[in-house]
Amino acid sequence: MIEASKLRAGMTFEAEGKLIRVLEASHHKPGKGNTIMRMKLRDVRTGSTFDTTYRPDEKFEQAIIETVPAQYLYKMDDTAYFMNTETYDQYEIPVANVEQELLYILENSDVKIQFYGTEVIGVQVPTTVELTVTETQPSIKGATVTGSGKPATLETGLVVNVPDFIEVGQKLIINTAEGTYVSRA
């Protein structure tokens, strides 16, 4: 059992028969009354997100999530296909369940498949990935890093804010946790 006050982003727990992943968690102390935990959560099975509050002392059953190394093969219609790199088993995951993760991976990328028991519940991408810029505004001569930046579309369709000196065709390092530009590759 884990208390609501100990829940952090990325953790998974069970509540009311649902498997829930914490997207955001914060303590909130209203002017009067006791502290509450405000959370943004995702139902792992349905993919729906919702906001809720819990008392800090409420307890939940922490879900045991196992991961296996896998490779992203391809996407067809509404299904993404992955292969376990140890056993060569293939997994089909609805695109709706991994839509955010697909913005960070290309075909043949290494990932980790997450299991709850025997049920595939998601994909874990590396903390940083290397992607190529496919579309952005032209560079401005003399641009520096201190500027406000400009939007750039990457090869997966992800749009990130980048410094003004970035050009089409350059490879960038992207932080997958925040969806932000880190550096040129």
Curated annotation (Swiss-Prot):
HAMAP family according to UniProt: EF_P (MF_00141)
Listed name of the protein: Elongation factor P
Keywords: Cytoplasm, Elongation factor, Protein biosynthesis
Highest taxon above the source species: Bacteria
CDD domains: S1_EF-P_repeat_1, S1_EF-P_repeat_2
Main localization of the protein described in the UniProt heading: cytoplasm
Pathway as given in its UniProt record: Protein biosynthesis; polypeptide chain elongation
Family under the similarity heading: Belongs to the elongation factor P family.
Compartments it resides in: Cytoplasm
SMART domains tied to this protein: EFP (SM01185), Elong-fact-P_C (SM00841)
GO biological process: peptide biosynthetic process
Organism name: Streptococcus equi subsp. zooepidemicus (strain MGCS10565)
Task of the protein: Involved in peptide bond synthesis. Stimulates efficient translation and peptide-bond synthesis on native or reconstituted 70S ribosomes in vitro. Probably functions indirectly by altering the affinity of the ribosome for aminoacyl-tRNA, thus increasing their reactivity as acceptors for peptidyl transferase.
Gene3D superfamilies: 2.30.30.30, Nucleic acid-binding proteins (2.40.50.140)
